Each structure stands twice: as C-alpha cells, then as structure tokens.
Amino acid sequence: MKNIKYKILFIDEEKDQHDNFLDYMDEIGDNVNVKCLYPEESIDTMIQVFEDERPDAIVTDYQLNEIKTEIQYNVSYNGAELVNFYREKHPNFPCFVITSYDNDAISTSKDVNLVYVKILMNGGEEGAKAKFHDKVVEQISKYKKSIDEAQSELTVLIQKKYGEGLSLYEEDRLVELDSFLEKSLDSYSSLPADIKRSKSLEHLSEVIDKVDEILAKLG
C-alpha cells in the first residue's frame, strides 16, 4: 500500500530557518512533503497562498518581521495572528506556531496548545514522549478523521430527516456538521436550504400565517 504524504507549509522570513526545519523534518521524510515559504506582506495575501497551496498542516514562526535578509518589506502580522485568522476560516485545521518568545506567542494565540518553543527542534526533545514532528502528523490524522466522522454522521442525519424525522438537537447538529464540512472541504457543497430548515421554524411560520389570516378576517 502506498504511503500517503502530508503536505506541510513552513512560514519564516529567514532562509536559514527554512533549511533547519527541512533538516528536522527529514526524520519523517517518507510521511511528509514540506514546502517553505516567506511571509507575504499582508495577511490576506498569505491566506490566499494557503488556499492555493491546500496544505494538510501549517507551521509558522511567531516573529515574521524580525530579520530582513531575504525579504525587504514589513510583515504586518505575526505567526499567532496568522494562525488565528486561518482557523477562523477553517476551524480546527492543524496549525502550529514555533517561537523563542513563548509568553508573547501564548498571549496572542487563541489556543495555547498550538504554540511550541523552538528548542524542541534543536536537541530539546531528548526523552520526550512525542516529538514535535510526530505531533504534527498526529494532528493531521485526527483532523482528517474528524472530517470522515462528520461526513458519516451527516449522512445518517439526512437519511433520518427524510424518514422518522429529527429532534431539535439533531436539526442543530445537522446544520453544525454542514457548516464544518463546508469550511473544511473544498469539494463540499453546502446542503440545500430545505434540508437544513428546522421543523420548529416551519411550525412557527405556519402559526404566523394562521394569525395573519385571523387578523385579516377580523379587520
């Protein structure tokens, strides 16, 4: 069976850091394909690069505007802000911020579990139960599994909606799963509005129509 290679983007303004990260990830070279990028000047442009590249995970340095060797422009955001912005568009997507300034990065990041100290990739993993690159691959696998499970659960709910019907909780869950998959999969098309329409809303609409009808007769 052919091994699946995960595509990982690494963002840093220094070429030396690109080389260091590539050397580090060589330990699991059979499992990943790493592409190093310099940060774009604006966060919107950087996000568009991500959309075009379609990676399985993103690893970014926290400081993206510190060393001006390879880039000559100012980068208006840091790695934590970049990850926060991308995960607003793609909830739970595997993203990681590596830094020497862990306190600043943690205070900026919306999820402290995304922040890792650089020393972990410079000999600081001795004795660790799980190395950083293993955690990256693990998070990718978990994310993909969550998508598969969401698709399966959504299929069951759609079938049940056209059969015995859904409870209010299940109707909310159907909308939640649909939204998650729409943000997670480029190939996914959102469900038609009639499928997501709640029975409670339909009932409310019927009540309003009847009230309007009664008021019209009284008038």
Predicted regions and their residues:
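Conserved acidic segment of CheY-like receiver
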Residues: N3-D26
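As written
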Residues: T108-L120
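C-terminal output/effector regions of signal-responsive regulators
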Residues: S141-G219
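Short, flexible/disordered intra-domain loops and linkers
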Residues: L64-N78
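Receiver (REC) domain switch-region micro-motif
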Residues: I58-T60, Y86
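Acidic, metal-coordinating helix/loop segments flanking the phosphotransfer/catalytic sites
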Residues: L37-A57, N65
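A short, hydrophobic beta-strand element within the central beta-sheet of small alpha/beta folds
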Residues: E81-A105
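Receiver (REC) domain switch/output surface
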Residues: I119-L157
